[in-house]
């Protein structure tokens, strides 16, 4: 469940550099997947993200 700086996992989501202690990012856009991020929250177990980005 912990995120590291080099592609650790956060729950179901594979992460790059994380936003916050355990927040995934959107890969193509590089912005946070979360309530405050432009991509919106991550949805579903395959890392799809609301807003057209991917985690």
UniProtKB/Swiss-Prot annotation:
Asked if the record carries the keyword Heme, the reply is: no
The reply on keyword Repeat is yes
Mind listing the UniProt keywords for this protein, alphabetically? Answer: Developmental protein, Differentiation, Repeat, Spermatogenesis
GO biological process terms, semicolon-separated: sperm axoneme assembly; spermatogenesis
Entry superkingdom: Eukaryota
Tissue expression notes: Testis.
The cross-references to InterPro entries, in alphabetical order and at most eight, read: MSSP
**A Pfam cross-reference name:** MSSP
Q: Which family does it belong to?
A: Belongs to the MST(3)CGP family.
Quote the record's domain comment. This protein is mostly composed of repetitive C-G-P motifs.
Its name, as the record gives it, is Male-specific sperm protein Mst84Dc
Which organism does this record belong to?
Drosophila melanogaster
